[in-house]
Amino acid sequence: MNRIIKTIIICFFVGFLNGQDTILSKDEVMNIAYAEAEQEGKNVFLMFDASWCGWCKRMDKNMNNNACKNFFDDNYVTVHLAIKESKENKHLENPGAPDFYDSLKEGTSGIPFWVIFDSKGNVLDNSLDSNNNNIGSPVTRDEVQVFVSILKDTSKLNDKELSVITEVFWDKAYD
């Protein structure tokens, strides 16, 4: 009897520990996001990123800045899908994410590449400007203006909130 109990306990802990390393698939991430967005009356802000991507980290840092974090949280369900990982970090990629990225981007695009969906999975907009260039993590005045315009069209953000976002994202050193 003790042997059976020990075996069950070991199996439980091995399963639990293995489960901690499980990376959700693109479908799992997106289905959870769509359901949450539907329930909360929000849109989905998807960012494709990678562990090595400095611009991705900058985008995250800006979106989570205390001055504007609530603006994003109140209007979007924000999710990430990892792609373009190095050979030794391929295990960090979400299964299905690279193909999803390829289906959404137009032409060549680096990361971060972001797409805004409604709660039904319809694309509302993405990080490509009118010239099909990826603004990714916007820093210049023009990039931030495009970003803020997209946010205005896909959220309930008011002009004051959009102004705060502009101040957080615009890095005058790049203009």
Language model features by range: what are they?
Residues 1-22:
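Bacterial Sec-dependent N-terminal signal peptides
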Residues 19-35:
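N-terminal "domain-start" segment that seeds a small globular fold
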Residues 23-26, 69-97:
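Thiol-based oxidoreductase modules, predominantly thioredoxin-like and allied folds used
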Residues 40-53:
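Short active-site neighborhood of thiol/selenol oxidoreductases, capturing the structured segment around
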Residues 44-47, 77-81, 113-116, 123-126:
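Structural recognition of the beta-strand scaffold that forms the well-ordered cores
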Residues 51-58, 112-115:
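C-type cytochrome heme c attachment motif
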Residues 56-73:
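Typically the conserved alpha-helix immediately C-terminal to a functionally engaged Cys/Sec
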Residues 102-162:
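Non-catalytic, surface beta->alpha helical segment in thiol-disulfide oxidoreductase systems
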